[in-house]
Amino acid sequence: MRLGVALSTIAVLLTATSARNLDKRQWGWPNFGGGNGGNGGNGGKTINDYKREQGAGRDIHVYAPSNLAPNSPLLLSLHGMDQDPNYQQSNTHWETLADSEGFVVVYPRGGTGMSTWDIQGTKDTQWVSQIIDQMKKEYNIDTKRVYLSGFSMGGMFTYHAMSQIANKIAAFAPCSGPNVFGASKAQRPVPIFHVHGTNDDVLNYQQVEGFLKNYRDQFHCPSQADTKTNYPNRENPNATLYTWGPCDKGVYIKHLKLQGRGHSPSSADIQDIWDFVSQWTVDGPVSASGNGGGNTTPTNPSTGGNGNGNGGGNTTPTNPSTGGNGNGNGGSTDKCSSNITKQGYKCCASNCEVVYTDSDGDWGVENDQWCGCGNRVTVGSGTCSAKILQQGYKCCPSGCIIYYTDEDGTWGVNGEEWCGCGSGSSSTGGGNDAPSSGSGYQGANGTNFCNNAKHSGESVTVTSNKVGDINGIGYELWADSGNNSATFYDDGSFSCSFQRAKDYLCRSGLSFDSTKTHKQIGHIYAEFKLVKQNIQNVDYSYVGIYGWTRNPLVEFYVVDNWLSQWRPGDWVGNKKHGDFTIGGAQYTVYENTRYGPSIDGDTNFKQYFSIRQQPRDCGTIDITAHFEQWEKLGMTMGKMHEAKVLGEAGSNNGGTSGTADFPFAKVYVKN
């Protein structure tokens, strides 16, 4: 009998004293606390705020925020053995996050045996799949952003679901419940966030490493974890977060170790879980897949929209309490009138400007107010398409600029067009965000390189690793394997071709003599246009600016795009400084110390990264602005050795192939 097999297997796993019976206490019966994390009831709604439904034959408790947007995510939270949805809800309170983050929560009821889960067969995976379909019909959820988290036996089922319905679940967060079948194979590499307490006397903590290793091996994750001690879990100051990745398909496995926690669900973990799972869709990271809030940008990039929508789906300012993110651009602070506040709009934070009024001066687009806290603009004409007018939007008056971003840098605001009729534009230099497909973006010399980029001048084709120079333009091709080549032109443009390379890079730009700092050289900018062709099997990638300094020895990256399907993440550096507005766009800054090959041989050196939050294929990079931001953070720059436009791609398995063409690439200095 299937249930008997499953329960006997579970009994073996419990602890060194697992000969004891599977009583209710061991499985988190409501009176069982275990450790210091059991109550979880820090406010929030009660089960009476939920809608109780019959979900494909068994009841489910559903919570949906009153202002739920279309294409919002779904999270399913599963109780432990011999428990019920009421107990799971009263300990986790997922609805408190659902209100602020905008997603649907479902608490299903277990139905196999003693309110347990079928962790070996298909009965309950089919039922969960039917619940997802039901939520699509009732709430129009985004079926690519469905997340599964379960406690105890619900956690065991969460692992089991990886082998059955990974095509319907984007990310998995088991809590205090390992996979009882150990090496059960997942249908695909999936993101995993496992939470477990060290004082768990039901499912012993010492078993966790072995269970997680099965999946790390399956997904070909790095053997060593990035370890963060004193991780700030809400209830546990002594938590430790372990991160393995990137693994196959760019996924990560994370484990939150809670010192002293027993065998209990807790609301203290839900923010950590949500922050992880919400980064993913079934197709990969949210930022790479384009799924995410249902934003619809105007369809004609040249006449009123960029067409680069990232699916961020933000409909409120980054900081709802102040209306701004604090990264002010130094502009004037617009005062809020009572007419604005009584309508429920937020005032701008200090040092932020109101730039997102429409052309007739109303706040937002007839409804919303937005604050601009980074002077992030897109240079383009104010012409209007019929498509824009049909949606009821205003055209920008003559002399105004279209602003396509909200304050946190995401493209579009639910498809709305914005006009900036004040400050904020310049057609030269850095700080302007050019649209990837171009709407007349002008480079430093007045060239419309986003639309008209093409290679010109003398060229040299390289088919093996080489550092060289062509009429004053420095270049390099390097690869560790495969059949690779690159063509470099003396106008700075270049084209990179790689076949079956484990790691490949090519770059072109300025070389220096390591005698002057960037301040002594002058203000450094770069302009680039990227065209991707037939890119395959890329696990990690950087497109942007690359270079070195000496004294101190620093390898630096400004990453504006990537050839992989996902944005470079926390794995690039062991110190994350945070998110900053640099040159008019949002970047995440990392710092790292490593030993390895460098321009001075194998030695210790620093690595600095700025990773753009939204990729672009064309634009101007204010390199000096990144140097200055790094220095504010205590990241010392040395004497400049080089600054070049970079295309780099790598694969953890099988090699990567494709072409990254840069028909326009230029690094230059303005004094």
From Swiss-Prot:
Glycans are attached at residues 238, 339, 445, 483. Pathway: Glycan degradation; xylan degradation. Residues 304-314 have a biased composition (Gly residues). It is an enzyme of class 3 (hydrolase). The keyword Signal applies. Residues 1-19 form the signal peptide. In the N-terminal section; belongs to the axeA family. In the C-terminal section; belongs to the glycosyl hydrolase 11 (cellulase G) family. This is Bifunctional acetylxylan esterase/xylanase XynS20E. It comes from Neocallimastix patriciarum (Rumen fungus).
